[in-house]
């Protein structure tokens, strides 16, 4: 358990690479409208395999050897990470993956904030907060990115 919550306490949507697609947006809209969810956490994790697959595809194109479904995941992650390859991080594969994981989490959180009229309205007028965070597979610690409200 990451947040020490019981079954039914959290509305959880799991998807490789924490990508944002219409089904995930619809699920979040449902949770926010139906159940009053006011905190959405885009939780990625260190050494994410989907992000790694995207980096590998960008560095060494496979020419379509991935399935159409896996390619759809890679294609959704690509815009968040491709700019890092021209950065200094590209010379250090471990650092590149770390930065790419965080960039992908941020991009997914931003997509949710600005990719749904329903969520935009809930953010503007009803206190919905969308934040990114990274779970460390090594330590079990969740590192929340900026924008998390202080506890009351």
List PLM regions with ranges.
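Short, charge-patterned binding micro-sites
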Residues: 46
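Short helix-loop-beta junction
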Residues: 2-15
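Divalent-metal-activated hydrolytic enzyme cores
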Residues: 8, 17-38, 49-152
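Conserved functional hotspot residues or short segments at active or partner-binding sites
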Residues: 42
